Amino acid sequence: MASLATFQVENDIVDVDSTPQQGFDRDDLYKYDDVEQKAILAAHPWRTDPSYFRNVLVSSIALVKMAMHARSGGAIEVMGMMTGKILPNTFVVMDCYPLPVEGTETRVNAQQEGIEFMVEYLQGLKDVGRRENIVGWYHSHPGYGCWLSGIDVDTQFQNQQFQEPFLAVVVDPNRTISAGKVEIGAFRTYPKDYKPPKKATKQNQDQSVPLSKAKDYGAHSERYYELDVSFFKSSLDENLLQLLWNKNWAATLSQSTIQLNHDYTSKLMLDLSEKNAQLAIGLGEKTPQSQGRGFREAMSKADNEPHTNLLNYSTKGQWEAVNRSVKDGVQIGSDELQGLMSLEIQRRLFGRAK
């Protein structure tokens, strides 16, 4: 179907039947070699190189299942486990499954019932001849991007202490709907007392984080690093993908992103308003009635004096915050415009949109 093809193109899912991924062909990815896996585990090179793992290869099946599970949680965080294997410098995620855990809008933790479910699920895999082991966990960040909070870092650090090698993946379902591409990130923590290079801890400055999360965002960046994520499939995956997709094809055609993400968009606009209010105060404004005047005066002076540097009127950090605020506003407007366009197309095709 066209929508499935679009999903695969948007997420750059590579067919390994014809194009190897990260130097690994189809047999490397799909064949489980017990001897090879035991040799890698026995060598445990990640103990001497904290950044040994640099890449994550995720199957198209696992990607779709994680995205659907994250979306099903709405504003509540969900959690699941990933199964697969290890290759040199690389995690291979073949499949995933959700955990029956209780989450909130800010955190999710596996309790005793979740641990019991994991044990039973792994035994079920062995019973049907699936030899993949757990290689990590995933959870959702509804609306606030892919990064690790302090709680996430502590959870991942403990997992790496007792279940190495282990990976943490974060999915943002709200931004996935807005962008049409799965918003996903993969991370690992550094050993205790390890000091990583500064460039390794620099997070994506273009990532927009809600004001309520700003304090936690980046506060633990020296404790973990991000891995490159890419996606793969084979011709054997096509039937499974079609089955997964066909369960939701009607909703895919009839639903509008502008309506699905209505609450999320409202929160984005409110958050942007609060950020702008703080920026105005930081730029010298003291009252709500005069917010924005200081920045307009600085812009006017810069227009009249071409060599004027706006950094003279605000600190570098404030100017970067203004730049991010502008980008956030443009992104919100762009997403809304695309949503309105898709809504109009659906109305012309079906007469109305749900």
UniProtKB/Swiss-Prot annotation:
Protein source organism: Yarrowia lipolytica (strain CLIB 122 / E 150) (Yeast)
Q: What class of enzyme is it?
A: hydrolase
Q: Does the keyword Zinc apply?
A: yes
Kindly indicate whether the keyword DNA repair belongs to this entry: no
- What keywords are annotated for this sequence in UniProt? Cytoplasm, Hydrolase, Metal-binding, Metalloprotease, Nucleus, Protease, Signalosome, Zinc
Q: Which GO terms describe its biological process?
A: protein deneddylation; proteolysis; regulation of cell cycle
What is stated about domains? Answer: The JAMM motif is essential for the protease activity of the CSN complex resulting in deneddylation of cullins. It constitutes the catalytic center of the complex.
Q: How does it assemble?
A: Component of the COP9 signalosome (CSN) complex.
Q: Per its record, what are the GO molecular function terms?
A: deNEDDylase activity; metal ion binding; metallopeptidase activity
What name appears for this protein in its UniProt entry?
COP9 signalosome complex subunit 5
The MPN domain extends over 56-193
**Family in the record:** Belongs to the peptidase M67A family. CSN5 subfamily.
Task: Give the matching Pfam families.
Answer: CSN5_C, JAB
Q: Where is this region: Disordered?
A: 193-212
Please tell me which stretches of this chain the record labels as motif JAMM motif. 139-152
